[in-house]
Curated annotation (Swiss-Prot):
Source organism, top-level taxon: Eukaryota
Recorded family membership: Belongs to the intron maturase 2 family. MatK subfamily.
Swiss-Prot/TrEMBL keywords: Chloroplast, mRNA processing, Plastid, RNA-binding, tRNA processing
Functional description taken from the UniProt entry: Usually encoded in the trnK tRNA gene intron. Probably assists in splicing its own and other chloroplast group II introns.
Protein name as it appears in the record: Maturase K
Gene label: matK
Length: 511
């Protein structure tokens, strides 16, 4: 770690040109696999190959020696088991190097993130990483908007596009050549095994074996796809700065402001006229994005046309226009982050009296509403073998050596995680049914293990089994409920967003 820290203190421009030598440092692989390789994909691969944890450092050294030998870095002509990629085991060596390579190329981006946070004086930046931080933003902004577009960001179909994307950020030519070699070799190997499935790089096998590298490449690709929003927003803000003067160093820019506005107007007048909208909001999670606006339907159609042409011309991606859906927020619900969100119109009547005359005033208040869709969630539970397709709880096959406490803790942890993630739902009826399914699935699993009945286990465990399926907040509310039922009932219906959720629950991710 000390060696890596010294390297990080080098000037940023020099780092981008000298990333490749880090690939031959042992501490990079130790850092990539959590200081000892325990619990990582690499450690599991070693167990499958018959290695133990003590020899992991020796394996890395042998791999680095083979990397120095150029004859092992040549693309194999015939894909056979005897002539494998980078040595004796292609998959094992590829995982090791891809994990280390992902750590190395993340260095310039990490430095930019740290410097940006320091300039903006953001101390608790981990709160910004939370998925639930998006939902309060939607709750605050979307109630004032009119139209929303569901956008599915396309995957890159050509390997060279990914390499050229990184070339704009990293000037280290050997690292880019190595990345190009990795991607082509992987697709060539897959085309030999499964010829019909070699068109796309981001397959399930690639994402599972090279998760860190996949996330880095995919995030880089998505950032480039989103560059059109950043570009148009900046140009639009430049035009508005003629009257507001929103420059940091105003004394140096006042003289050039008029000329700058004239140039931008001449070059981008038509484009900005199409897309300038002060009430445009954009959010994204993984490959799905939401674009909402207060403008008219025509403006959203122009954005759709521009995005399709931009992705096709700039990234050579054939994107189907029907993958972007434009709907009105007042009569349409959109699915995002495991929630079915919509804008409800609450009507209320207020009686006003002035002297002898009374008036009845009707008011309409827009409210952003989020609910949990029960049918997709039950489908996810059925896929995980907790229930059947109709939502009836079933028993899960477990290992004989699993104790009753381990089984109860596992089911309870899944239930608490789902309740924790869906705490922002305005209606808790769906969560009640999910808890019922998981609780009785746990009871059926225990009854199956001991060859008994469900009623017997429910009588024996009683409240102990119920407590495992309650979150900490529900346990506190259950204590308050005995004192005063009305306030606790209201608090139980409140929506709560947690800033400690960094990833979506697997059972909730059924998009």
């Amino acid at each position: 770690m000390e060696e890596l820290q010294r390297y990080l203190e080098i000037d940023r421009s020099r780092q981008q040109h000298f990333l490749y030598p880090l690939l031959f440092q042992e501490y990079i692989y130790v850092l990539a696999h959590d200081h000892g390789l325990n619990g990582s994909i690499l450690y599991e691969s070693m167990e499958n190959l018959g290695y133990d944890n003590k020899s992991s450092s020796l394996i890395i050294k042998r791999l680095i020696i083979r990397m120095h030998q150029q004859n092992h870095l040549m693309i194999s002509v015939n894909h056979s088991n005897q002539n494998r990629f980078l040595g004796y085991n292609k998959n094992f060596d590829y995982q090791m190097i891809s994990e280390g390579f992902a750590v190395i190329v993340e260095i310039p981006f990490s430095l930019q993130l740290v410097s940006s946070l320091e300039e903006k004086e953001i101390a608790k930046f981990h709160n910004l990483r939370s998925i639930h931080s998006i939902l309060p933003f939607l709750e605050d902004k979307f109630s004032h908007l009119n139209y929303v577009s569901d956008i599915l960001i396309p995957y890159p179909t050509h390997l060279e596009i990914l390499v050229q994307t990184l070339h704009r950020w990293i000037q280290d030519a050997p690292s880019l050549h190595l990345l190009r070699f990795f991607l082509h070799e992987y697709t060539n190997w897959n085309s030999f095994i499964t010829p019909k499935k070699s068109i796309y790089l981001f397959t399930k096998d690639f994402t599972k074996e090279n998760q860190r590298l996949f996330l880095f490449l995919y995030n880089s690709h998505v950032y480039e796809c989103e560059s059109v929003f950043i570009f148009l927003r900046k140009q639009s803000s430049y035009l508005g700065s003629k009257y507001s003067g929103a420059f940091i160093e105003r004394t140096h820019f006042y003289g050039k402001m008029e000329y700058l506005v004239v140039v931008l107007r001449n070059d981008f007048q038509k484009t900005l006229w199409l897309f300038k909208d002060p009430f445009m909001h954009y959010v994204r999670y993984q490959g799905k994005a939401i674009l909402a606006s207060k403008g008219a339907h025509l403006l959203m159609k122009k954005w759709k046309y521009h995005l399709v042409n931009f992705w096709q011309c700039h990234f050579y991606l054939w994107y189907q226009p029907d993958r972007i859906h434009i709907n009105q927020l007042s009569n349409h619900s959109f699915y995002f982050l495991g929630y079915l969100s919509s804008v409800l119109l609450n009507l209320s009547a207020v009686r006003s009296q002035m002297l002898e005359n009374s008036f009845l005033i009707n008011t309409a208040i827009k409210k952003f509403d989020t609910i949990v869709p029960i049918i997709p969630l039950i489908g996810a539970l059925a896929k995980a073998k907790f229930c059947n397709i109709s939502g009836h709880p079933i028993s899960k096959p477990v290992r004989v050596d699993s104790s009753d406490s381990d089984i109860i803790d596992r089911f309870g942890r899944i239930c608490r995680n789902l309740s924790h993630y869906h705490s922002g739902s305005s209606k808790k009826q769906s969560l009640y049914r999910i808890k019922y399914i998981l609780r009785f699935s746990c009871a059926r699993t225990l009854a199956r293990k001991h060859k008994s009945t469900v009623r017997t286990f429910l009588k024996r465990l009683g409240s102990e089994l119920l407590e495992e399926f309650l979150t900490e907040k529900e346990q506190v509310i259950s204590l308050i409920f005995a004192i005063n039922s009305s306030p606790s009932h209201r608090s139980y219906r409140e929506r709560i967003w947690y800033l400690d959720i960094l990833c979506i629950n697997d059972l909730a991710n059924h998009e």
